Curated annotation (Swiss-Prot):
GO terms for cellular component: cytoplasm. Pfam families: Cpn10 (PF00166). GO terms for biological process: chaperone cofactor-dependent protein refolding. HAMAP family: CH10 (MF_00580). Heptamer of 7 subunits arranged in a ring. Interacts with the chaperonin GroEL. This is Co-chaperonin GroES. Gene3D superfamilies: GroES chaperonin (2.30.33.40). Together with the chaperonin GroEL, plays an essential role in assisting protein folding. The GroEL-GroES system forms a nano-cage that allows encapsulation of the non-native substrate proteins and provides a physical environment optimized to promote and accelerate protein folding. GroES binds to the apical surface of the GroEL ring, thereby capping the opening of the GroEL channel. Its main location: cytoplasm. The keyword Chaperone applies. NCBIfam families: PRK00364.1-6, PRK00364.2-2, PRK00364.2-4, PRK00364.2-5. Belongs to the GroES chaperonin family. Keywords: Chaperone, Cytoplasm.
Length: 103
């Protein structure tokens, strides 16, 4: 079997799932103290990298996702599946776990 090369462009979310590039977490506190990885909080903000086709309704139609590629979003803290890709952090989650679009 051939090896699969994963890149952001090859990840195609299914249904109402959204693929988000996680924003960098703070490296130090407001007072200037450097934080170890174990003390950093999991970021809840990221940029939409890929969008699924939308939720399938009972009548067979699709519900169009409310977010688009490039949108900056706020999502639930423990939502989705964490994925590392090319040194960057991503999360794959359901659209219902997105709380807001940030402008």
């Amino acid at each position: 079997m051939a090896a699969v090369s994963l890149t952001v462009s090859t990840v195609k979310p299914l249904g109402d799932r959204i693929f988000i590039k996680v924003s960098e977490s703070e490296e130090k506190t407001a007072g200037g103290i450097l934080l170890p990885d174990s003390a950093k909080e999991k970021p809840q903000v990221g940029e939409v990298a890929q969008v699924g086709p939308g939720k399938l309704n009972d009548d067979g139609s699709r519900q169009t996702p409310e977010v688009s590629i490039g949108d900056k979003v706020l999502y639930s803290k423990y939502a989705g599946t964490d994925i590392k890709l090319g040194g960057d952090e991503y999360v794959l989650l359901s659209e219902k776990d997105i709380l807001a679009v940030v402008s």
